[in-house]
């Protein structure tokens, strides 16, 4: 399992590809990853110019920041996909981005071709946004160079004809399917979808709680506004009580020299130790 910054990131902030003045500001917003969007955020007539401007925009960014950059290209089968794929291959080759988000991911072959284009140093994030993508989720998760799975909750609803309430209860089985595919492929925790109303912090908190690693198994969330970043990062991290428990577990197992010990009347064995270690590792991943 990857331990790169993007593998551990809790937040991924979208920013339009055709607004280069926002790219540096997005990196400075404290998000774990920035997704520069050539798809939904850019009108068809502006896609070519937006694509052509990425080299200059990214070259002006700090090298450390580039390692947190992903580009969402247009989906396979669209008129812009092939040109996007060539562009991101060049960007990865020049060390200007870490990888690529593929929307409407439905076929492992598309990821294979994208991996071949960007080379082995590039990372891929397939965005599951359709019934076909869900049906192929194990193949997508197992494709080469996949970093994490991501869930496009709004597009998925549109694809299958759902009209979910705020709690998105109808999508629980879908999220579970992504979680299980992630586990089978040995990937870091998946990335949950957006909360569309960025001003509704109560809704954001509820959405993030639903996606919490402890409850829903998701370790990160897509964000559409900088104001969402800090609350999501905090909500997806371990609580003070969880950290205190994790430290006590590690101390107990070290004092015993390994094996199985009892703590607060409960058995502490290898799975419990791994959970404690994971909580402490999450706490060690600060906002960027």
Q: Would you name each region that the model predicts?
A:
Residues 1-288:
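Expand to "…catalyze enediolate/carbanion chemistry for C-C bond making/breaking, isomerization
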């Amino acid at each position: 399992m990857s331990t790169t910054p993007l593998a551990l990131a809790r937040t991924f902030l979208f920013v339009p590809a055709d607004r280069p003045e926002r790219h540096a500001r997005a990196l400075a917003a404290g998000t774990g990853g920035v997704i520069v969007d050539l798809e939904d955020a850019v009108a068809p007539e502006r896609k070519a110019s937006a694509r052509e401007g990425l080299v200059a925009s990214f070259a002006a960014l700090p090298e450390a920041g580039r390692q947190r950059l992903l580009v969402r290209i247009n989906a396979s089968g669209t008129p812009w996909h092939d040109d996007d794929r060539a562009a991101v291959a060049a960007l990865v080759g020049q060390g200007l981005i870490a990888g690529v988000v593929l929307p409407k991911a439905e076929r492992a072959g598309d990821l294979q071709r994208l991996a071949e284009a960007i080379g082995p140093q590039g990372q891929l994030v397939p965005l599951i946004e359709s019934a076909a993508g869900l049906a192929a989720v194990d193949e997508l998760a197992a494709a080469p160079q996949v970093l994490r799975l991501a869930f496009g909750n709004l597009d998925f609803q549109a694809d299958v004809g759902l009209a979910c309430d705020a709690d998105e209860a109808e999508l629980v089985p879908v999220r579970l399917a992504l979680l299980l595919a992630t586990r089978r492929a040995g990937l870091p925790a998946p990335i949950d979808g957006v909360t569309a109303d960025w001003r509704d912090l109560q809704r954001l908190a509820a959405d993030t709680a639903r996606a919490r690693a402890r409850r829903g198994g998701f370790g990160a969330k897509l964000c559409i506004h900088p104001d969402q970043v800090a609350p999501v990062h905090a909500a997806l991290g371990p609580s003070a009580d969880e950290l205190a428990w994790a430290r006590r577990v590690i101390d107990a197992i070290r004092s015993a020299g390994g094996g199985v010990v009892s703590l607060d009347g409960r058995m502490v064995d290898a799975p419990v130790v791994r959970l404690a270690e994971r909580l402490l590792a999450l706490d060690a991943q600060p906002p960027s």
